[in-house]
Regions:
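Gly/Gly-Pro-rich "capping" loops immediately C-terminal to redox-active cysteine motifs
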Residues: 36-47, 59, 63-101, 190
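Asp-box/WD-like beta-propeller blade repeats and closely related beta-sheet repeat scaffolds
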Residues: 233, 237-317, 330-338, 343
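Loop/turn-rich, solvent-exposed surfaces of beta-rich toroidal or solenoidal domains
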Residues: 399-404, 410-413, 441-526
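Structural signature of eukaryotic scaffold interfaces centered on beta-propeller domains
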Residues: 146-163, 203-206, 245-254, 294-307, ...
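Flexible coil segments in periplasmic/lumen-exposed cytochrome c-class electron-transfer proteins
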Residues: 30-36, 40, 51, 109-175
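A short beta-strand motif characteristic of beta-propeller blades
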Residues: 188-193, 229-236, 277-292, 330-337, ...
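Axial heme c-ligation environment in periplasmic c-type cytochrome domains
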Residues: 64-74, 95-130
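Short loop/turn segments immediately following beta-strands, especially the blade-tip
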Residues: 223-228, 271-279, 325-329, 370-374, ...
């Protein structure tokens, strides 16, 4: 059996949201003998679990990023010139089982309510073996996977349904490989569309017609919202493990191109925006900001500029931010900006000139000036910033700010951002400084969110090990951030019975007009999940969406807000 076939059998699905193994790894452990070798069936099962639950944070080659290095043995040079050694063999099977089962204070969730005792033991043995190196994936293989289900000539010339598309939500159904298109006005599911496994994000074309949905198995689906019943019109597999996608938004290039970035192989693919026909594959392997070669520099996040024909492509392990000029694909120009490791997610400031991204292993936020094509600032923050897209608002004292939460600390960090408005000149002294750290009710935050028409700031904490904290969201009045306006237990508001697994409240998302906030209640695969819709002014429940077809809803992407980068 060839390596590609072995890989595809073992890695048909990919990583979800497990997070950093932190303090538990710092504890000393006696060297342990290698675990018994796995059988072929055990290895295939373990490989599947690893890609579903672990690879997103620890890497395909297990070299670590947000999560720790999980190689059997590793060494590294310390600043004083000495050598430190570690690895999963040194930790030993018993210690590894405890970490996997119970999680850590550093942000890794417990898996004893997801995996059986035997599966936990299997994974402890699996990560003590040397990881396999998966195969590459070329332009030819990408093109061979490409399918146009509805040609452009056969698609509608105008919107054929009567839905308010601006307030439609594309909702990830993590464990079923689907997205639900939910009407934001009526709260009805208008369509459930088969996509790649564990969709990471949905992104909108500049026109608002197309939704680009990237699954963690590398499958990119293009959904046409103008059809009477919105459906997939084209798809392509861009790699074995992927996270990011965006489109061309600059004037004259609207909807012309799409770009998707992979975790494995480490590369990005440029495609036709209306058909997904692959045009170019570009590898991201190269040197880190420390001057060392890295074999697995994954594409973390991608955003599209409206001020230039450019994509901002963030390379996780190298700490390099790429400005990819798509005005001439054949003669591609790429500006490489050094920042810090390991780059993850981020978003635009209010002016859409500056892009801010978390370098979460360095506990920093990197800010890029896309007008000059240079790094604007590196800002030190608390442990493991995780902004999602972040949140923009006007602070009563410091003017325009951008907010990020943290996986590793119980704060929401506010950073002053520049503004060309004459009235904001008085805030220039604060630019690129942390001006306030708002006290959160716990670490483990993934997303913060607000809206231009709202007075509130919302934040979740789904990765916190405490049930009460993980099942709740916190709301602050942006005019007074000294204390929370309200802590909302989403699990209780859902009206669903308590389950053995923690039901994690995740990803607050505003309606197009800013009057509602939708929060996912993410339960186990066999448990009933829900989306709880809140009135943003009264903070009371307006609707609980609990359709049986809606299994493990996670990210929710409002069409208008996503189309216009409103957050």
């Amino acid at each position: 059996m060839g390596i590609r076939k072995q890989w595809l059998m073992g890695a048909a699905v990919v990583a979800a949201l497990p997070l950093a193994i932190s303090q538990a790894y710092a504890q000393a452990a006696a060297p342990a003998a290698a675990a018994a070798a796995l059988t072929a069936d055990e290895k295939a099962n373990a490989k599947k679990i690893y890609f579903e639950r672990c690879a997103g944070c620890h890497g395909v080659l297990r070299k670590g990023a947000t999560g720790k290095n999980l190689e059997p043995h590793w060494t590294r040079k310390l600043p004083d010139g000495s050598t430190q050694e570690g690895g999963t063999l040194k930790l030993g099977k018993d210690r590894l089982e405890k970490i996997i089962a119970y999680g850590t204070e550093g942000g890794m969730v417990n898996f004893d309510d997801i995996l059986s005792k035997d599966e936990i033991g299997l994974m402890a043995r699996y990560i003590q073996e040397t990881p396999d190196v998966p195969p590459e994936y070329s332009l030819k293989e990408t093109t061979d996977s490409w399918k146009v289900l509805v040609p452009v000539s056969e698609r509608p010339k105008k919107q054929m349904n009567k839905f308010n598309l601006k307030n439609m939500f594309s909702v990830t159904l993590r464990d079923t490989g689907e997205v639900a298109l939910i009407d934001g006005d009526t709260k009805e599911i208008r369509s459930i569309v088969k996509t790649g496994y564990a969709v990471h994000i949905s992104r909108l074309s500049k026109s608002g017609r197309y939704v680009y949905v990237i699954g963690r198995d590398g499958r990119l689906s293009l959904i046409d919202l103008w059809m009477e019943k919105p459906a997939v019109v084209a798809e392509v597999k861009v790699g074995f493990d992927a996270r990011s996608v965006d489109t061309s938004k600059f004037k004259g290039f609207e909807d012309k191109y799409a770009i998707a970035g992979s975790y494995w192989p480490p590369q990005y693919v440029i495609m036709d925006g209306e058909t997904l026909k692959p045009i170019k594959v570009v590898s991201t392997r190269g040197m880190t900001v420390d001057g060392e070669f890295h074999p697995e520099p994954r594409v973390a996040s991608i955003v599209s500029s409206e001020k230039k024909p450019e994509w901002v492509v963030n390379i996780k392990e190298t700490g390099q931010i790429l400005l990819v000029d798509y005005s001439d694909i054949k003669n591609l120009k790429v500006t490489t900006i050094e920042s810090a490791k390991f780059l993850h997610d981020g978003g635009w400031d209010a002016s859409k000139r500056y892009f801010l991204v978390a370098a979460n292993a360095s506990h920093k936020i990197a800010a890029v000036d896309t007008q000059t094509g240079k790094l604007a600032a590196l800002i030190d923050t608390k442990k493991i910033p995780h902004p999602g897209r972040g949140a923009n608002f006007r602070h009563p004292t410091y003017g325009p700010v951008w907010a990020t939460g943290h996986l590793g600390d119980a704060v929401v960090t506010l950073i002053s951002t520049p503004s060309d408005k004459p009235g904001d000149a008085k805030y220039k002294q604060y630019n690129w400084k942390v001006v306030q750290e708002v006290k959160h009710n716990g670490a483990g935050n993934l997303f913060v969110k607000t809206h231009p028409k709202s007075k509130n700031l919302w934040a979740d904490a789904p990765q916190n090990p405490d049930r009460e904290i993980a099942e709740s969201v916190v709301v602050w009045d942006m005019a007074d951030l000294s204390k929370p306006k309200k802590v909302i237990n989403v699990a209780k508001d859902s009206g669903l019975p308590q389950t053995k697994a923690i039901r994690r409240a995740v990803h607050p998302e505003y309606s197009a007009d800013g009057t509602e906030v939708w929060v996912s209640l993410w339960g186990g695969k066999t448990d009933q999940s829900a989306i709880v819709v809140y009135d943003d002014k009264t903070l009371t429940v307006k609707k609980v969406i609990t359709d049986p077809k809606m299994i493990t809803p996670t990210g929710k992407f409002n069409v208008y807000n996503t189309q216009h980068d409103i957050y």
